């Protein structure tokens, strides 16, 4: 039974390495030491995995590919595998790879920051029958990105591979998945706003932090494996991508908002309701300029409704 398994695995290596850029993750599940995969680019080890299995079977299967092998038993992510012939024995193949580990990690929340421009509502005159308060649609957008910082140089000059770090942190924090970049762009209806008021949308974002290390290794089967010392610490901050992706709040005081835009008005002319009989009404105002197609103000909708009543 065991010899039959080795024949199957040997045939599998040929299929996997012949087209390394298109490694079949399901096929990797047949290899000893592999338990599951994420459907993207990472396979996970069994709990009793030993590193010798990586050099013997897994490294040849993922060489020159983007596949990451996550050794769950040691909490190490391995990948970027390359092969080379031995200078002493051309029939021996050495495999070189890099691997990462998370030393410690946690989560935190960003400070509140503006997510939109400021929107003002102009003064009402005595003939304006617009309600003292009404909601306003506020377009907003923001982007949050990961960062990797070398404590010594305050930069990521060593070009650490974020994919390895994501695999490790997603396994540790299964309730808080991370991405390189998380963004959101939409329209939110702000609370009731009075004349003279300004409104601006602010956001705060959940983040994950970690201190990570990288190591370079080389191995040959059955000769064994040698690794360099673990590197110094690198600090990682990355945005979470689970819902809700952010928290929001509105600010409506001039001394609280931070307006990147010049003051504007929500309507170019005061909004009035003019009676034209016992039951019919019409709206007289100019619509605000809309930044995004399909986004209309409350009063634009009312105008259409009352106009239809006047025509009928």
From Swiss-Prot:
Keywords: Signal
Superkingdom: Eukaryota
GO cellular component: membrane
Species assigned in the record: Saccharomyces cerevisiae (strain ATCC 204508 / S288c) (Baker's yeast)
Leader sequence residues: 1-19
Protein name: Uncharacterized protein YCL049C
Other facts noted in the record for this chain: Present with 656 molecules/cell in log phase SD medium.
